[in-house]
Amino acid sequence: MRHHALHTIASLILLISACELPPRNPSDTGPATDKKETFVTSDTSSAAEEYVMVTTAINLPLYVNHDQAAFTAWGEKTGVKTTILGPAEWDVPTQIATIEQVIPSRPAGLLINGTDPGIAQAIRKAVAAGIPTVVYDSEIPNSQRHCFIGSDWYEMGRLQGERMAQLLGGKGKVAVMGILGLENMEAGFRGFLDAIKPYPEMIYLGKYDDKANVETAARIAADLISANPDIAGMAGFDSNSGPGMALAVKEANRVGRIRLTTVDAEPEHLALVQAGVIDYLVGQKRELFTALGAQFLYDMRHGTLQLSNNDARAGVVPIPHTVITGSIEIDKNNVSQFIK
């Protein structure tokens, strides 16, 4: 999921101290592309071969515990160097600048978090430079990336809408919240709305911008409850939507009477499901799309599966164009399987 607020200054300090990113020497450059090749290939692999992840908000627990952990573990297993770069806060312009700063060093591959459509031009530059480039998490249209691997947000919204209709018996007032304007979440909102359309007695109150902030989500939820005392359900689309909605529902003493669904399956979300405050979670397979995305870069670099005499010269990209990794559905019946 995309951008999420850190809960406390103390946790931020602890996290930063625990998340030392590997050093990177910008003077180290990989081989340039053969003028006849569309991307750089290599017959050999070494510990100095560098794969770079470029994200934003690099200290977010969701990213640190899933994406970055999986990427680092993949590098250790494969015997190559992995580097994680990006701003500490949610800062798309700095993510773009980071991508552009990395390109001249020609790493073996770029794994880029699809945070915002605005990063498309920087991705196109990386591809034009012959760097194997995979976008993960959310698709970036017009980026010319070699591969996208991640979640189908429309489907995540549809799953929430279907479960909400089931929880409410097909009737009642509902609202959604997340980060307005982000392509993935807007797709999620559409999926939710399409799922409840067959139920004329379900009244859609609209979508609200919680800015991925727990306090903002709680305030919006409280305002919705105040303005609509008969509200029956709320659905969340960023990692902090669920905890914020849950806080408001608990404070209003409406647990079990206002049904909640949301994305992500962090420990806080799981505990709220176990406590009966949140009814349903749609989790992403973050470790899967990160590790597979990195492996696709390696396979492209080393021609693991050749589709022609020389894929780079033939203009053939020997990895999947698009991979949807699916979702994980969690409720009271299986939540115990996810609590560590």
Where is each model-derived feature located?
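Hydrophobic alpha-helical segments within soluble ligand-binding/sensing domains
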Residues: 95, 149-174, 216-218, 265-269, ...
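C-terminal motif of bacterial Sec signal peptides marking the signal peptidase cleavage site
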Residues: 16-18
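Extracytoplasmic "Venus flytrap"
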Residues: 37-44, 48-78, 83-96, 113-117, ...
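An alpha-beta-alpha
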Residues: 52-60, 71-72, 159-207, 297, ...
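Flexible loop/hinge segments that line or gate small-molecule binding clefts
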Residues: 117-155, 166, 173, 266-274, ...
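Sec-dependent signal peptide recognition
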Residues: 2-11
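Hinge/cleft segment of the Venus flytrap/periplasmic-binding protein
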Residues: 20, 25-49, 195-196, 292, ...
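Hydrophobic alpha-helical
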Residues: 99-100, 108-127, 192, 210-272
